[in-house]
Amino acid sequence: MTCFTSYHQRLIFTLCFLLAVPGCTKDNPQRHLNLGNWYLQRGLVDEAIMEFREVSRLFSGDVSKLKRKEYNILGTAHLKLAIAYTKKGWWEYALNEAKRSFEITPNKDCHDLISLIDEKIALKAGGN
């Protein structure tokens, strides 16, 4: 007799979600951003990075032609990518993404993240 635990139920739900989502996210930056956030919240950093990078790829053309909502999606994707890179310890990549996010959608969160990453890089350089 097999007994499903809550772990098994969550695993089955996650697998069903992952099987259903790829078809829904085709060329839809907002859905890739949402999926990246979902992965990041669950600690699936590599998967989150792939989704945030896909948003960037989908908007790889002339960003000056983007609508306001698209600017926000792209800026958020770069910010989240910077956060994901910090979780991997990839500080230079994180700094580049945070700066890119600030260029697209300047705000306090981006500015603060850039400052924190700069401090971390300086501490690492001083410790070596």
Segments the model singles out, each with a brief description of its role:
Residues 24-39:
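Bacterial Sec signal peptide processing site at the extreme N-terminus
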Residues 58-71, 107:
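Flexible helix-coil transition and linker loops at the boundaries of alpha-helical arrays
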